Amino acid sequence: AIYTFIYPNNTPSDFCTVLGTRAGLVGPKGNATKFKRLLINRFLLETIVLSAVKLEDMPDGIELRELGELLRSQYYILIGTDTDKDYSLLDQAKIAQDAPEDLRGELASNARSIADMLITMGLAKRYADGVTIIGWGL
């Protein structure tokens, strides 16, 4: 009720977008872009991963693909671990058509970059077969 009283001409989504942008969690800054995205830093990534994965799964770990499914189902965050499914969701939301580059390739690159960041943080390990496992003490 307070929100609608103070900001009668904006939606809650507009408020969250502005708040996220000013906090540095959402970008790019400015009004030049139609769609905003999460700007992943180590703290935000660690928080999101640890909130999505059950603690009892961490000692043995889960695959990056499973993390992608968890983030998709719990938070509607697409990281590119299943490019076909993620692209389909972006296409349904009419976001894929506005992307200037090869979106499927960008999704796969995004998943690799997130895996690399998790590895440098000590939350994941990539094995010789290319599978990345997220967990403790791997």
Positions of PLM-derived features:
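Long, low-complexity, charged/polar intrinsically disordered regions in eukaryotic proteins
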Residues: 1-46
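Short acidic, hydrophobic short linear motifs in intrinsically disordered regions
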Residues: 58-72, 78-99
